[in-house]
């Protein structure tokens, strides 16, 4: 682990797949040790991993990570086991948009070509804007970007 790179980051973005290997668990544990210096975000990734990784998830959420993100089903599944797991929560609501804490933004109605990468686009764009814009505008721009990703065949917009 390159400590100086981690410490120079605005956010550390980790996910539930990280908890599927010993090295991944070590990386997550280390990241939580420096959470006072770098904001930590954690993605739930898949509902099946929530129960599978429950013991490690409990350790993570005792640390009150900065932003938890996932889709509605993942957030609901997690709440069956752990309540109030993060300081902030970003929820992807699919074609209905997204929610950040108490802020809801609806997505534009489109013909979806492929939703692959939309969740990653949502969190990536939101994090890119969150330090520069107020939360509602950052979320609005993130939903707009994720919507555009759904209009192409692939997870990235070509520039």
Predicted regions span which residues?
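Conserved post-catalytic alpha-helical subdomain immediately downstream of the catalytic base
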Residues: 108-159
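Ribokinase/PfkB-type carbohydrate-kinase core domain
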Residues: 1-103, 158
């Amino acid at each position: 682990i390159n400590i100086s790179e981690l410490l120079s980051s605005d956010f550390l973005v980790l996910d539930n797949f990280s908890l599927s290997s010993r090295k991944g668990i070590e990386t997550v544990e280390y990241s939580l040790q420096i959470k006072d210096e770098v904001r930590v975000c954690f993605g739930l990734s898949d509902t099946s991993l929530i129960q599978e990784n429950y013991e490690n998830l409990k350790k993570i959420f005792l640390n009150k990570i900065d932003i938890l993100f996932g889709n509605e089903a993942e957030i609901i599944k997690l709440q069956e086991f752990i309540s109030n797991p993060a300081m902030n929560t970003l929820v992807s609501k699919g074609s209905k948009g997204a929610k950040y804490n108490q802020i809801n933004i609806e997505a534009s109605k489109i013909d979806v070509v492929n939703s692959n990468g939309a969740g990653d686009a949502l969190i990536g764009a939101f994090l890119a804007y969150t330090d520069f814009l107020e939360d509602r505008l950052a979320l609005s721009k993130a939903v707009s970007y994720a919507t555009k990703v759904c209009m192409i065949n692939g997870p990235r917009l070509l520039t």
